[in-house]
């Protein structure tokens, strides 16, 4: 287990987590996977994606991409929805489901950050602390 020394002054990732639901969880399992060079054959993201679908996890938060990506290298996609053009920005989603034994399952799935890794790590710790 990795422990990172933290204080109230070091919780600079808090403002980057956008909660749509803020559940209080006990004994939760947290799984995170990110696309990128370390996701050989998409093994990690496929596994976490499968578990997210298997346990019907619903989105409870996102990590704001603005601070963590160079959008010249991780480009948003554009799509048409009816007569309107929509931009889909890269996103890291936090989802919540329930395991067969009743424990909460929290998954984080998205794109490996390109910038501000320490701040991104603090944002993940914010999710884990909840």
Q: Where are the regions that the model predicts?
A:
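Internal, conserved structured core segments that host functional sites
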Residues: 101-130
């Amino acid at each position: 287990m990795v422990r990172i020394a933290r204080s109230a002054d070091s919780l600079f990732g808090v403002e980057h987590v956008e909660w749509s639901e803020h559940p209080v969880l006990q004994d939760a399992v947290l799984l995170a996977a990110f696309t990128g060079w370390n996701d050989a054959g998409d093994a990690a993201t496929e596994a976490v994606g499968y578990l997210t679908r298997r346990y019907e996890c619903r989105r409870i938060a996102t990590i704001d991409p603005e601070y963590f990506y160079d959008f010249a290298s991780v480009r948003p996609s554009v799509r048409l929805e009816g007569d309107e053009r929509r931009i889909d920005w890269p996103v890291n989603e936090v989802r919540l489901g329930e395991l067969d034994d009743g424990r909460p399952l929290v998954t984080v799935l998205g794109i490996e950050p390109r910038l501000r890794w320490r701040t991104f790590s603090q944002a993940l710790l914010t999710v884990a602390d909840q």
